[in-house]
């Protein structure tokens, strides 16, 4: 395993606590230029940075940090939105931030080149699909720093991987889903079958299996086969109709807890749950209640990935000339991933289940429970 650095996200991810686009954009400041959900995510990221005791160093040089987003768009209410919020949270008089959105896979390399040509000090690729183009650019432009969300290092001094052990937090989500289901059936689906997606699904199904083992139950998990490493996928991160079709099919199979791992497509699943009243949803990447409050009534929890804080940190490191190619790995132990609060569902989840989740989290963090 490659050496990884650790960045604590403070206490951003508690378990079981209730709490009452154009293609190019530079430093939007509210109003018509930024969705409310993204502003709220930015506030959450800023709060996490405050926990870390982060302050911006004085600098005469202006640092330009740029994000190359995938086709999900900046307002996907998931990892793109989280990445942009993280960048915004460290923007100030000495740091400017901007992003480019890809309309298709063919835009990845040209968008990265455009950002380099514009003088970006660091280019952050958001999403596994852009990893190859970013690694190639790192070799071609050694004077520019690069970082990739959901990808590993490229073996060059100017390229950093930002990775997350989301199978750990998804294991907790699977255990929670198995304890909550009334029908004995839960489900998950993904956008596309690659590690940044399947890690969530694999952890979720294994969490269900763990619940069955310790409770001597037989909850069924649809959508992912941990042996075959394959399951139910939309095929992209933009087909709302297909995501809706999958969600309805799961309900027909009696699934009453659904975990979509497909970025903004989770909205189709949540909207269906609100309409059908047959299921609840586990959101992915960001806190769904904050990112997509219109779905609050059907979101039992969210599996969090500390994209925003890791993006903010790598920008700060570039600004202070402390950039390192050592990959970052967010885990339960360093709070780089975790579960969101239960919000409206807090009273519906037993104290025993909450305590079990805490014990499981500690065991995973300590290494005594292997996933």
What is the predicted function of each stretch?
Residues 4, 36-37, 362:
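Intrinsic disorder/low-complexity segments enriched in polar/small residues
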Residues 6, 12-34:
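Short, Lys/Arg-enriched N-terminal segments with co-localized hydrophobic residues
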Residues 29, 57-60:
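N-terminal low-complexity, Pro/Thr-rich disordered segments
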Residues 33-44:
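Bacterial N-terminal signal peptides that target proteins for export
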Residues 50-58:
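C-terminal segment of classical bacterial N-terminal signal peptides
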Residues 60-371:
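A residue-level marker of the well-folded mature domains of exported/periplasmic proteins
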């Amino acid at each position: 395993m490659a050496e990884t650095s650790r960045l604590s996200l403070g206490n951003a991810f508690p378990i079981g606590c209730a709490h009452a686009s154009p293609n190019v954009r530079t430093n939007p400041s509210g109003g018509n230029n930024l969705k409310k959900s993204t502003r709220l995510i930015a506030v959450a990221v800023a709060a996490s940075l405050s926990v870390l005791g982060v302050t911006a160093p004085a600098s005469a040089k202006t640092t330009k940090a740029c994000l190359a987003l995938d086709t999900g768009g900046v307002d996907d209410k998931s990892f793109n939105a989280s990445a942009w919020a993280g960048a915004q949270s460290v923007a100030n008089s000495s740091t400017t931030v901007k992003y480019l959105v890809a309309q298709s896979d063919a835009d990845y390399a040209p968008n990265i080149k455009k950002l380099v040509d514009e003088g970006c000090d660091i280019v952050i690729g958001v999403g596994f699909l852009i990893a190859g183009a970013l690694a190639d650019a790192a070799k071609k432009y050694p004077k520019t720093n690069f970082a990739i969300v959901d990808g590993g290092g490229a073996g060059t001094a100017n390229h950093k991987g930002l990775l997350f052990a989301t199978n750990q937090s998804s294991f907790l989500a699977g255990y929670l889903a198995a304890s909550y289901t009334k029908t004995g059936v839960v489900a998950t689906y993904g956008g596309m079958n690659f590690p940044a997606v399947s890690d969530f699904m694999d952890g979720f199904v294994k969490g269900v299996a763990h619940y069955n083992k310790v409770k001597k139950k037989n909850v069924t998990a649809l959508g992912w086969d941990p042996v075959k490493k394959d399951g139910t996928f939309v095929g992209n991160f933009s087909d709302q109709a297909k995501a809706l079709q999958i969600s309805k099919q799961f309900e027909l199979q009696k699934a009453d807890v659904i975990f979509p791992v497909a970025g903004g497509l989770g909205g189709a699943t949540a909207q269906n749950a609100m309409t059908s009243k047959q299921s609840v949803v586990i959101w992915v990447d960001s806190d769904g209640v904050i990112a997509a409050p219109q779905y609050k009534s059907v979101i039992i929890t969210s599996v969090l990935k500390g994209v925003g804080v890791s993006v903010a940190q790598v920008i700060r490191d570039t600004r202070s000339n402390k950039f390192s190619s050592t990959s970052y790995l967010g885990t339960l132990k360093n709070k780089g991933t975790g579960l969101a609060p239960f919000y409206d569902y807090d009273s519906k989840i037993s104290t025993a289940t909450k305590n079990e989740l805490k014990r499981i989290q500690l065991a995973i963090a300590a290494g005594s429970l292997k996933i």
